[in-house]
Amino acid sequence: LNFTTKCSLGTLADEQVYDRLNLSLTKSLENMNMEKVNLFLLHSQLREDDFKLSNFNEMREKNSTSLSSYFNAVIPAFEKLKQEGKIDHWGIGGLGQNEALVKAINHEIPPEAIQCVLNPLNSAGAIAYVDENFDPTAILKESQKNNLPILSIRAVQAGALTGSMDREPHSSGFDHKDFDDYVRAAPFRELAAKWDESPASLAHRYALSVSKVGSVILGVKNRIELKECIKAEEKGELATEQFSALKNLF
C-alpha cells in the first residue's frame, strides 16, 4: 500500500511555506498513525505571479500558489521534508493556469507525481476556476511527454459522467459547470447503454486505458460505488475501438 496526503497552501511569504507544509503533514501523520507518507501533494492551483484568476480572483492568494513561491519556497520545502524522512516523494495537483503548469512540469526540478484531470469531456468543471481556458488534455500530454507519474482525477467529472447527479446545484452557482457537463454528456450515457455498462464504470475504464496513467483516484461516497469501481478495474482496459469512440465523442 502507498499513502498520500495533500496541503492547500495558497501563496505565503517564502519563510512561512515550510512551516505550513510541515504542520499540515504532521497533522496527517498523527491522524493516520504513521511516521511518513509515500506522496505529499501541493493541493493549491498554480499560476504565474501576475495572472488574474478567471473566477474568484479575490481569493487568489488563498486558493492558488504563484510560480515564484512554488520555485523558491515550495520545492525546497518538499525536498527538506524528504531529507527529514517524512515523505518519499512530492507532487502537484495539475490544476491552474495552463502556462504555469507547463513551466512547473518542465522545471529543472520537476514534480515527482502529478494529478491530471482525465475524462472524455476534457473538463475539470467547477474546479477550473483559475484559468477559463484550462485544458486538461494539454497538461496530460505534457506530463506524458516528460514521463511524470500520473494520478488520474475527475474520472466521472463530479458526477457528470454517471447515470444521474447525486445532488442539487449549489445555491451559489459555483458548480453550474458540473451540471452543464451532465447535460453535455448525454451521448456518453447513450454509448454506455449501447455497450451495456454503467456510465461510471465506463468512465473509470476510460481513465485506466490512457497511456502512462499509474493510478485513478476515486471520489466514491459509499461501498456500493467503491465496489462498482473495483469491478470496472477488473474488467480491464477498453477495447481500442471503444476508447477511440469515447476520445472523439466530444
Sequence positions of predicted segments:
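Short acidic capping loops at alpha-helix termini that bridge into adjacent secondary structure
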Residues: L1, E35-L39, D88-H89, A200
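Structural motif corresponding to the early beta-alpha repeats
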Residues: L1-D19, L42-L46
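Intrinsic structural disorder
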Residues: L1-N2, E30-K36, G219, L246-F250
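N-terminal binding-site loop/beta-alpha segment at the start of enzyme catalytic domains
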Residues: L1-N2, N22, Q83, N119
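Generic enzyme active-site microenvironment
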Residues: T4, K36, L41, Q115-V117, ...
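Short, acidic/polar
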Residues: Q16-N31, G96-I105, A203
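CE4/NodB-like, metal-dependent polysaccharide N-deacetylase domain
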Residues: R20-L41, K80-E84
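Beta/alpha (TIM)-barrel catalytic core signal, keyed to glycine-rich beta->alpha loops juxtaposed to Asp/Glu
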Residues: Q45-F250
